[in-house]
Amino acid sequence: MAFNLRNRNFLKLLDFTPREIQYMIDLAIDLKKAKYGGYERKHLTGKNIALIFEKTSTRTRCAFEVAAFDQGAQVSYLGPSGSQIGHKESMKDTARVLGRMYDGIEYRGYGQEIVEELGAYAGVPVWNGLTNEFHPTQILADFMTMLEHGKGKRLDQIKFAYLGDARNNMGNSLMVGAAKMGMDIRLVAPKAFWPEEDLVAKCRLIAEETGACITLTEDVKEGVLGTDFLYTDVWVSMGEAKEAWDQRVKLMTPYQINMDVINATKNPDVKFMHCLPAFHNDETTMGKEVADKYGMKGLEVTEDVFESEHSIVFDEAENRMHTIKAVMVATLGD
């Protein structure tokens, strides 16, 4: 069933019903099939899209650009040093300027209140590419990937665990998404790194309606048992000081996804997910610093898990583009 999401902002999953979320995922699946099949139709021809990036990006930027190009749109990239936003011009004013020039605006940056203000004043669809609190386009890609690898299970039949820093934008967003879609989510983390209590309470209220199960636990074995998917993210988020590493590594090491954790699921077909980039070896500058300082080749996930048959991280990364395309088509397409 089609939904009319035209001219809607896409700022956080809390703003959407389960059926609207499922519609966007289904649309992404259809668009992916069309791209691979060579019969994709352009729904954004003649549209101009602004991409505001106050934080750097690989996957999100590329996904928005390729998705827009595939659909016939033109994009302008405004990078961290490429505009006056927040320096000489407020977001409220920027929104009203860009809204006169562009048909849609993506924002990736800091506080959720910034993208909310952009959405309130732009007068055109605004899409959240990541804020400190939420990362909704990633969740659409994650759930699409779970459907592809879930052996025919619906989202409300899937069990998954998120290990690590559960108070960050990924922990928040996965919990909201799971609550909306009636899923069984286990947030496995030190108690100090659980999501804010008010957000947990909101999600539990949603879960009462959807049948979702939300578990917060510090016990890794209890949290991962019987899951279909294991998910993690970096232990120190974008913008945090390097000084945070020492304490974070000490607290988070028990929550590393390694082969012992894979085996603890008791599911030989369990799949591993990560929004990327991941610290899984010492082949990057940061990875080498970590290896030299802590004697660990890999932090939140080990190399043997990341490169194993359990890992579906690159399918997940590709699906960023298909789901972002679906969001733009649903809210801006003809």
UniProtKB/Swiss-Prot annotation:
EC number of this enzyme: 2.1.3.3
Pfam family for this entry, one: OTCace_N
Superkingdom of origin: Bacteria
Subcellular location: Cytoplasm
S-S bonds: none
Enzyme kind, highest EC tier: transferase
GO molecular function: amino acid binding; ornithine carbamoyltransferase activity
Any one GO BP annotation for this protein: arginine biosynthetic process via ornithine
Main localization category: cytoplasm
Family: Belongs to the aspartate/ornithine carbamoyltransferase superfamily. OTCase family.
Entry-linked NCBIfam families: orni_carb_tr, PRK04284.1
Protein name: Ornithine carbamoyltransferase
Gene: argF
